[in-house]
């Protein structure tokens, strides 16, 4: 279920503070965050945000097409390597 339009999008306070500080200084640096549930807002466009996937931080460059999505959508947590091969010779 999607979030109600009467509510504002969720962005972690610490992440929002970092974005606003960089925007006022007009600097670009990698922002490290564990907040995968934060919604991407227009103030984040042009920044590189390193999102935690459970093991490491993946740097993601935010573009205008990502606005409205969650940060966690862009850093996959699972690494599917394929199903096990069916080796009939080893069974005999």
UniProtKB/Swiss-Prot annotation:
Species lineage: Eukaryota, Viridiplantae, Streptophyta, Embryophyta, Tracheophyta
Any one of the GO CC terms: chloroplast
Family to which the UniProt record says this protein belongs: Belongs to the universal ribosomal protein uS19 family.
Cited Gene3D superfamilies: 30s Ribosomal Protein S19, Chain A
Keyword set includes Transport: no
Biological role stated in the UniProt entry: Protein S19 forms a complex with S13 that binds strongly to the 16S ribosomal RNA.
This protein's name: Small ribosomal subunit protein uS19c
Localization of this protein: Plastid, Chloroplast
Organism of this sequence: Lotus japonicus (Lotus corniculatus var. japonicus)
InterPro entries noted in UniProt: Ribosomal_uS19, Ribosomal_uS19_bac-type, Ribosomal_uS19_CS, Ribosomal_uS19_SF
